[in-house]
Amino acid sequence: MSAYLKNYEELLFDFPAPRVLRITMGDPERLTPVSGKMHAEMVTIWNDIDADEDISAVILTGGKKAFSAGGDFALVEKSMSDFHFRMQTWKETRSLVYNVINCNKPIISAIRGPAVGAGLVCGLLSDVSIASKNARIIDGHPRLGVAAGDVSAIIWPLHCG
């Protein structure tokens, strides 16, 4: 395993086949909420993968119950109450979109269960998105009183036609 992968704490890695990296977002036994730390890791991992000559393809997956549960409550609360943190998170989200799109390795997302938030962004921006019969694509913004309009709201209709 590439040494830099050990620097990531909230993303889990394994190689199901030679040169194929599988990324599991968070604890596979939980609903995979995205913490501030995981959000930051999701931004930087794509540049690391792109530069890694030992990786030819990526599979992105979540836990057994959910692909991604969206931002954890601490992340959401801090984003709502701390202007500077909110601006940092928005910048990270912009970088997340660019980094996934600019990664030259094929990315395949395996979406099972609910898919919300930053995990959903990565899933929908993947080169190939495979959704199970129980996959649910959810924009959680309206539930928080926030207008829908992140990249998920833009990219999903483009995928569906």
Predicted regions and their residues:
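Conserved CoA-thioester-binding segment of acyl-CoA-metabolizing enzymes
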Residues: 1-63, 98
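Glycine- (often His-adjacent) and acidic-residue-rich active-site loop
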Residues: 5, 62-99, 115, 145
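Hydrophobic/aromatic residues within transmembrane alpha-helices
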Residues: 23, 60, 72, 122-123
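Conserved phosphate-binding and hydrolysis motifs of nucleotide-dependent enzymes
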Residues: 32, 72, 113, 119
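CoA-thioester-processing core
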Residues: 96-102, 110, 116-161
